[in-house]
UniProtKB/Swiss-Prot annotation:
Lineage, broadest ranks: Bacteria, Pseudomonadati, Bacteroidota, Flavobacteriia, Flavobacteriales
Organism: Flavobacterium psychrophilum (strain ATCC 49511 / DSM 21280 / CIP 103535 / JIP02/86)
Biological process according to GO: tRNA modification
Protein family membership: Belongs to the IPP transferase family.
Site note Interaction with substrate tRNA, residues: S100, R122
Record's protein name: tRNA dimethylallyltransferase
Keywords: ATP-binding, Magnesium, Nucleotide-binding, Transferase, tRNA processing
Gene coding for it: miaA
Length: 307
């Protein structure tokens, strides 16, 4: 029986140190599913593990891509599963760690695959949105995929106010002639491993304090210079992220440096709240306080593997 020990939790909670301790305990590798840490040009602002940490266990999917490459969650799923198959042939226990819930889910449950849509369809939808606003997209989705519209309305109503998501739903409907919901993964994907999910949590005040400290450390380590180097490419998808966006606004003279740093802290706190919301929905997670003794966590994992 293969086991994938998956460590989840918000940013700055201590997932890296726990994953390394477990990798040493089980003599195995670590798969990173932190989508911000894939890119080699973004090191400080994404809190990539230090060289010392990376030397303590073999890590995969850290700084292995360039911001100039298009890399999707579907690509990651394929590559991660291929890598896990290879690793499981040597050791039946492996570790996955990261704060990107969508990417973790893709490995654990499979990712919905959508056909490519012609760019001109997207352009037309964009024009309609520019002219008629979000109501146009809401009406269109209700008309083209009533089932999915109702599902969003009942489960996640704020999505109806998100133009990017709504345009995506409508373009899939118009580009394929089928409802968006027909492409969602209805079949249970079977994996060749059993998952043990360990979640780390802390009180909000502690979390926020850790985030503020981490941002200060990033600034001291040279985040400003890293962002400045990336500034000419600021419109790339990979760079539309906390820690860089705010400094680009400083370079644009929209923010003072102090204000940009405060915005990074505020937006990272918001990001961590969204992570917590996502992870709290993850079934069968065994939650531990961020200061929990590693030996206790190992004990629980070993018990799970015996059953």
């Amino acid at each position: 029986m293969n086991y994938l020990i998956t460590i989840i939790g918000p940013t700055a909670i201590g997932k890296t140190s726990l994953s390394i301790a477990l990798a040493k305990q089980y003599n195995c590798d670590i798969i990173s599913c932190d989508s911000r840490q894939f890119f080699k040009e973004m090191r400080i602002g994404t809190a990539v593990p230090s060289d010392e940490e990376l030397s303590q266990a073999t890590h995969h999917f850290i700084q292995n891509k360039s911001i100039f490459e298009e890399y999707t969650v579907g690509d990651f799923e394929k590559e991660a599963i291929t890598k896990l198959d290879e690793l499981f042939s040597k050791n039946n226990i492996q570790i996955m760690v990261g704060g990107s819930g969508l990417y973790a889910d893709a490995v654990l449950k499979g990712f919905d695959s959508f056909p490519n849509i012609k760019p001109e369809i997207r352009e037309k939808i964009q024009e309609q949105y520019d002219e008629n606003g979000i109501q146009y997209l809401q009406q269109k989705l209700q008309e083209l995929d009533t089932e999915y519209y109702s599902k969003i309305l009942s489960q996640n109503p704020q999505t109806l106010q998100n133009p990017q998501r709504m345009m995506r739903f409508v373009e899939v409907c118009l580009g394929t002639g089928k409802p968006y919901s027909s492409f969602l993964n209805k079949d249970k994907i079977t994996r060749n491993f059993t998952t043990i999910i360990i979640g780390l949590e802390a009180d909000r005040e502690i979390m926020y304090d850790r985030i503020n400290q981490r941002v200060d450390i990033m600034i001291n380590e040279g985040l400003l210079a890293e962002a400045e180097k990336l500034y000419p490419n600021k419109d790339l998808n990979a760079l539309q992220t906390v820690g860089y966006r705010e400094l680009f606004s400083f370079f644009d003279a929209d923010f003072t440096l102090n204000f940009a740093i405060e915005e990074i802290k505020k937006n990272t706190r918001r990001f961590s709240k969204r992570q917590i919301t996502w992870f709290k929905r993850t079934e069968n997670t065994i939650w531990f306080d961020y200061k929990a003794d590693t030996s206790k966590i190992i004990e629980v994992i070993n018990t799970k593997m015996k059953h």
